[in-house]
Amino acid sequence: MVFLLCFFLVADVSYGINGDCELPKVVGPCRAGFRRYYYNSSSKRCEKFIYGGCRGNANNFHTLEECEKVCGVRSRDSPKEN
């Protein structure tokens, strides 16, 4: 069991970004107007969008911090590595 857990953790790190983060932004057909964040694979950043409230996908986060954590994006405020 521990071996499997280690394997999946290494595999996740090795292959980079969570697959859900590669999904396109989906606003959805409803009109609720929730502020959400998604990972933009072109800019390699989490960005704000307005979510309609239904028929979205997993690339839809309540906070910028949650998006950055799940998608492996460093915060804009963290110091750059040399």
Swiss-Prot record:
Chief location category: secreted
Cysteine disulfide partners in this protein: 21-71, 30-54, 46-67
Propeptide feature ranges: 76-82
GO molecular function per UniProt: potassium channel regulator activity; serine-type endopeptidase inhibitor activity; toxin activity
Pfam families, per the entry: Kunitz_BPTI
Segments forming domain BPTI/Kunitz inhibitor: 21-71
Function field: Serine protease inhibitor that inhibits both tissue and plasma kallikreins. Has hemolytic activity. Inhibits voltage-gated potassium channels (Kv).
Family: Belongs to the venom Kunitz-type family. Sea anemone type 2 potassium channel toxin subfamily.
Protein name, as recorded: U-actitoxin-Avd3i
